[in-house]
Amino acid sequence: VKRAEILEATRVCVCGEREQDYGTPENNFATIGYFWGVYLNAAHPEYTKAFPYNGITAKDVAAMMALLKVARIATGSSADSFVDLAGYAACAGEIVTAENGGTA
């Protein structure tokens, strides 16, 4: 698979079907971060000060999902994992740009 094909598959996925299914990355990742925080506080109360329930941001979720993909790539990769990795990076970049008032 060529770079351009991976990036095109990422664009189709991230800018089309994923957003239609799950909403914007900012909103979806913020919800995931909230639930992860609630879970971590319930499962590991000793971490409450370090990770308050609202302390995992949409940007954090994008970064951690990218790390999940890197871990999968390390143990056996398929082109799909690289498509997903590029998608999480693109979403993180968009989230950071929005947080910075539209500048990267």
Language model: regions and residue ranges:
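Intrinsically disordered, low-complexity regulatory regions
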Residues: 1-104
